């Protein structure tokens, strides 16, 4: 299975490099790279794990677009391996392989898995937590509880959204028919204590920054309109159902293409009820399957219901990490007949889809920018802007460009694409990443940037007047050309504020 996951990650890295060749990397990826430039216990909006991993990754690999796609696919490859281990706790190897290939066909694990960020990293840490729970539930030992607590802490260090999954696991432990055995053992209580102790350093950081992530969440995702919340919830449900429909439909196709002769043999075998029941018990661990079913149902229903109750802005991307158990929940249905031929079929479907996409990806990239040059934010040539501003800074001061003051959409790509990797200073946001400050920016000098197309242009220019009164204004226009097709021409208003000395 490690070989399959590695092949999937390698092939889809090649695909994404070609599919995204006409674009700069997503701002979320650049943000994670920026976090990784400085080790902290948190980064304003989120816990630190995504930044730590990005920092480690780019100490090994070059700061290049392809390395970001490789990071995303390496993350998903690890997720596939962990989901394989989860599946083996519930079903036999045949069904477990079917589950993993279904996940590889799930768009989150291929097309939509192009941007490394805390949402994507949850597809490693949440499966690890589920695996630890499925290990602790039957063992009920101190050591299994310790691993469960550490896995929970690791997940919480990825994104606070994982509380959704932690709550689902807690409910599974309370609802499961064998709950008395588990709750009467040391495992769950050791897990709770371990998680609490492991989170102490981060909790201290939260107090030091006055719980700024909660300020961020309340400011950005709290809504006043219940009707608008309901609209977002419907969009979230529809979006994630469509994504799940892809692997489910392809799995159904793989099952339907089993020859009639093999299906008839299965029907004849099922006439021997006692043998049939024994076979069911051999391939599905019903006790563990119940855990999986409960967890998946709770997170599937809990997120939209919670958003409706608390009027929260429910982003479609928040479903990225919540449905990796769906293929297993379906394949673990004991009455499902899974022939060896179905494994060949679904593996063949994966191979055909992957190879066809690999061949077509250069043409898809060229066609997309030709048909809709304003269709993606990444078509704006921020990488060229970063290079030109770096040259402008060096020509004036002959020092490293240390700070960029801009919105996330503009500033984070500067951090990634400039060889100086300046830290981004947020403009009038109370949830600073902590990577720099206005005092440090004024001491070291900075470049402020306003996008002339942004609705917030007046606010950006007002900030520059207030904080960069002595800055040199500079106007730069960038435009990307990809295989003869032009992207949007963007005018950027830059402000070069010199160092204090």
Kindly give the residue locations of the regions a language model identified:
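Transmembrane-lumen/periplasm boundary regions of multi-pass, lipid-linked membrane glycan transferases
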Residues: 166-288, 299, 304, 309
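Membrane-proximal, lumen/periplasm-facing interface regions of secretory-pathway glyco-
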Residues: 22, 312-316, 340-399, 408-423, ...
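Short acidic/glycine- and proline-prone juxtamembrane loop motifs at membrane-interface regions
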Residues: 108-122
């Amino acid at each position: 299975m490690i070989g399959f996951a590695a092949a999937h990650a390698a092939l889809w890295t090649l695909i994404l490099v070609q599919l995204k060749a006409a674009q700069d990397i997503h701002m979320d990826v650049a943000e994670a790279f920026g976090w990784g430039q400085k080790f902290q216990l948190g980064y304003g909006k989120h816990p630190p794990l995504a930044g730590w991993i990005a920092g480690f990754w780019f100490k090994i690999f070059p700061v290049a677009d392809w390395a970001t796609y490789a990071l995303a696919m390496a993350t998903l490859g690890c997720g596939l391996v962990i989901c394989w281990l989860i599946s083996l706790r519930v079903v036999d190897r045949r069904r477990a392989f079917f589950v993993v290939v279904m996940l590889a066909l799930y768009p989150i694990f291929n097309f939509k898995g192009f941007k490394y960020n805390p949402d994507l990293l949850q597809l490693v840490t949440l499966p690890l937590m589920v695996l630890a729970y499925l290990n602790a539930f039957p063992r009920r030992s101190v050591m299994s509880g310790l691993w469960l607590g550490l896995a929970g802490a690791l997940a919480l260090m990825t994104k606070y959204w994982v509380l959704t999954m932690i709550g689902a696991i807690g409910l599974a432990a309370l609802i499961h028919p064998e709950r008395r055995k588990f709750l009467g053992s040391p495992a769950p209580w050791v897990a709770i204590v371990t998680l609490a102790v492991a989170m102490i350093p981060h909790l201290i950081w939260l107090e030091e920054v006055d719980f700024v992530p909660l300020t961020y969440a309340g400011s950005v995702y709290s809504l006043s309109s219940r009707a608008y919340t309901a609209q977002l919830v419907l969009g979230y449900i529809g979006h994630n159902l469509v994504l799940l429909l892809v692997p489910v439909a392809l799995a159904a196709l793989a099952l339907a293409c089993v020859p009639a002769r093999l299906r008839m043999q299965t029907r004849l075998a099922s006439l021997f009820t006692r043998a049939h029941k024994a076979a069911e018990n051999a391939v599905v661990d019903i006790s563990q399957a119940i855990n999986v079913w409960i967890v998946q149902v709770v997170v599937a229903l809990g997120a939209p219901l919670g958003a409706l109750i608390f009027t929260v802005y429910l982003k479609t991307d928040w479903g990225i990490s919540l449905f990796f158990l769906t293929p297993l929940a379906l394949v673990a249905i004991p009455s499902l007949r899974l022939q060896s031929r179905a494994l060949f079929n679904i593996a063949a479907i994966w191979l055909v889809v992957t190879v066809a996409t690999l061949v077509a990806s250069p043409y898809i990239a060229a066609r997309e920018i030709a048909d809709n040059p304003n269709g993606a934010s990444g078509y704006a040539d921020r990488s060229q802007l970063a290079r030109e501003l770096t040259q402008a800074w060096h020509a004036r001061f002959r020092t490293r460009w240390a700070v960029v003051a801009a919105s996330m959409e503009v500033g984070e790509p500067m951090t990634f694409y400039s060889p100086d990797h300046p830290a981004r200073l947020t403009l009038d946001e109370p949830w600073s990443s902590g990577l720099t400050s206005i005092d440090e920016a004024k001491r070291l000098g900075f470049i402020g940037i306003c996008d002339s197309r942004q609705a917030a242009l007046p606010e950006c220019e007002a900030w520059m007047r207030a904080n960069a009164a002595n800055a040199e204004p500079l106007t730069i226009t960038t435009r990307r050309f990809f295989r003869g097709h032009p992207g949007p021409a963007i005018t950027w208003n830059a402000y070069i504020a010199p160092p204090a000395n």
